[in-house]
Amino acid sequence: MSLLTNYEGLRHQIERLVRENEELKKLVRLIRENHELKSAIKTQAGGLGISGFTSGLGEATAGLSSRQNNGVFLPPSPAVANERVLEEVGIMALAPLAEMLTSLQPSATPGSLMSPLTGTLSTLLSGPAPTSQSSPLTSFLTSPIAGPLTGTLASSLGLPSTGTLTPSSLVAGPVAMSQSSPLIAPVMGTVAVSLSSPLLSSTATPPGVSQNLLANPMSNLVLPEAPRLRLAEPLRGGPTGPQSPACVVPTATTKVPLSTEPPQSTQDPEPLSMAFAGAPLQTSTPIGAMGTPAPKTAFSFNTSDTQAQPSAAQEQVVPASVPTSPTTSPTVTVLASAPALAPQVATSYTPSSTTHIAQGAPHPPSRMHNSPTQNLPVPHCPPHNAHSPPRTSSSPASVNDSRGPRTTEPSTKSMMEVERKLAHRKTSKFPENPRESKQLAWERLVGEIAFQLDRRILSSIFPERVRLYGFTVSNIPEKIIQASLNPSDHKLDEKLCQRLTQRYVSVMNRLQSLGYNGRVHPALTEQLVNAYGILRERPELAASEGGPYTVDFLQRVVVETVHPGMLADALLLLSCLSQLAHDDGKPMFIW
């Protein structure tokens, strides 16, 4: 009798489970319809340019379909929280039934009373063993909705979460997240970062967001992008050393003749510039031409003072093979070469080109010279003929192919002062070609427009930061996350994060109304800066035509300078800069 009673009770439980299963399936259909409806609404809202910000606690990512075109998310509706509560309650209600069915299964006999649902539920709810997808409840629990259910159940029971944090997992409960993430590990207590936040989206990114963000955005926070720097900034106070190729500004230089004769310097109409493709020079006492060849160095050198004295005739002669370390003095120590070295160096004079010094075959070790060379001062004698033939040298010297024993580092301040003095003397003694000077100045104005636009966008979002090293328009979302972290406990300051994000969205909405595309124009600004350079002195000092820069004047500069294929985008950048300057009431060029 007791066995029949148990069977009867079990049959009622199974029937109740079947009814609950039907109700759960209806709930799943409603949830799916709700998700599809929200996805459609978000897609339409993204097409209309509607933006918002969400920083909800425990928000789960809804997949690619929930992202808007501009990468900004709408806040979740209250129905989402109710759905999670229902899902959690449904799983908690099935747990005791699974335990009872597991305990009764060995003593039960096969019959019509034992529905296949019992075994399925017992297997499904008793452990992580793989189950068949044919059961309706199994398919429900293994559907995309089941991802948050598992994490929610573990969190509600107070169990520690040992799995890694992925974009599809739900951050809920006290601490239910992976401790291996560099950003999420400090986020404790009630603070939980939503992985569907617009700051971490990877596919439909907001305007200005880099397109190479990975699917797991946590790993992208430690991948800084190459910053854009002014060429003169390392001379103001930064450490000296090899310059990055990203900072090289294309300039016009002079082919420097290299021979055994002290040449009279050739006149170069281009302004002073120095762009290193390798490493700087090293000043040392020559030991002689060694048999071991030094590394090849290719650099462009442009002098601003073009006269030379007989005692200082070797100023512009550059060694064919020089050690790569910083110099000591403002001027470059030049070593006269042996006659065999003359064919190894390009000596033709070609304006607007770079001087490539190639190292030829090394001299035999037996040829050793001990004649000292001196560090030559900047010449101050009257100018000579710009293209007169070189005269014969009377002091032999040798090429230093190895590192000298004495090296010191230059003072960045003295280097910058010498550079300014040389540029001033050149403009006063040797007037440049007006047409070439105007073209070079206008090209730098175009690059300055692009640079100032990026600087204005960044300063609008991070006004409290004086230095923006490493900040670009493309990595603004990552920098917002970094700026929102508390340096003491590394917790996310949600209020600060929301305030910075609102500034970012506001600036991008203003620029989008002018035609600015956050996925196209940040890269274009970098291209313009690298192609045309930037101003090398304060804008008020570099202003031409008797007054400050105006929009009309800058439009004429852009039209006459930029290639026709990029002209429309360059004019758009100028209009965006003018609009931002009008909004904050500051000059267009902020130094």
Swiss-Prot record:
Localization in the cell: Cytoplasm; Cytoplasm, Cytoskeleton, Microtubule organizing center, Centrosome
Residue ranges of coiled coil: 1-42
Similarity annotation: Belongs to the speriolin family.
Biased composition (Low complexity): 317-331
Gene Ontology cellular-component annotations: centrosome; cytoplasm
Oligomer status and interactors: Found in a complex with CDC20, CDC27 and TUBG1. Interacts with CDC20.
Lineage, top ranks: Eukaryota, Metazoa, Chordata, Craniata, Vertebrata
Name under which the protein is recorded: Speriolin
Pfam families per UniProt: Speriolin_C, Speriolin_N
Keywords linked to the UniProt accession: Coiled coil, Cytoplasm, Cytoskeleton
Extent of the signal sequence: none
Residue segments, region Disordered: 302-331, 346-435
InterPro entries, per database record: SPATC1, Speriolin_C, Speriolin_N
Tissue specificity as recorded in UniProt: Detected only in testis.
Amino acid composition bias (Polar residues), ranges on this chain: 302-314, 346-357, 390-401
Residue segments, region Necessary for targeting centrosomes: 1-78
